[in-house]
Amino acid sequence: MDGQLAQLAALVAHGNEWMAGDRARQCTVAAGTTFQYVNAVRFTLSEGRNVERPITAEDPSAWLEGLAERGVNSLWLDPRTADPGPLPAHIAAAFANGTRSSILAAGHNAERWIAAWTVRQPRAPDNRIWDVHYVGSSDRSGLREVPAIRSAHERLVGAASAARDLANRFGWTDWAQWFAEALTVADSSAPTARFFDDALPPSSELARRRLFALASGSYVFGGMGSWNDLAAPNPNGEAEYLEVSAELYTTVLLAVAAAVNPVTLTSN
């Protein structure tokens, strides 16, 4: 799974747990795998109601405390599935800052937070090459519709199954096996995400952990050699490959958002 998307998900999931629990304790999300290659992170609120000058936090805990002080009571992952430019979204996702998904902080005054990842130390001995800067601003656009957990789960099972079946027909045996393994967590009683398993707090409900694990295992949109770098074995199959890939990317993003956003399971 893309580390930038995973970090958004982790901030939302762990941030909501912190807001709903004991706020005297620190949020430990920065110690998790979504920050393992991050050298520094900064959060800057650039403008908003009653903001006379930029407000900066140097870690997630300080950011969350500032949000709470400004009346924020929940965080939401807002997935952007539309094509961000000339490249299809599932192709653009292979590049740094390729996703335009963001965090919506809701409460007394809504804020939208967008991340920018920059390589600052390309030869860092501990591989912490990235500096991440989240910029927040007041927001009135609201949250795009995100499916309920159950419907997101069903749609992603269908999309991953379609990708598996296409891979089998095209002779891509390794990819067929990849998706088959991803689908094994769909009904697991103890799901483990293939990547970033700690993005969700341990207290997360089974349905959320199962959906995130399925999304993590189904995310195949990287650089060279990834699923989105392939070409169909015949011209007639190219359109189907692109259609299946676009649907898979959309459903993965929606599934990640459904897994971490603070909706009640009884409504799904």
Where do the language-model regions lie?
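Serine/threonine-rich low-complexity intrinsically disordered regions
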Residues: 2, 56-59, 78, 88, ...
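Mixed-charge (acidic/basic) macromolecular-recognition segments
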Residues: 125-193
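Generic detector of well-ordered alpha-helical segments enriched in charged/polar residues
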Residues: 9, 61-65, 92, 157, ...
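Extended, non-transmembrane interaction/recognition domains
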Residues: 2-149
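Phenylalanine-focused residue identity feature
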Residues: 35-37, 43, 95, 170, ...
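Alpha-helical oligomerization segments
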Residues: 180-268
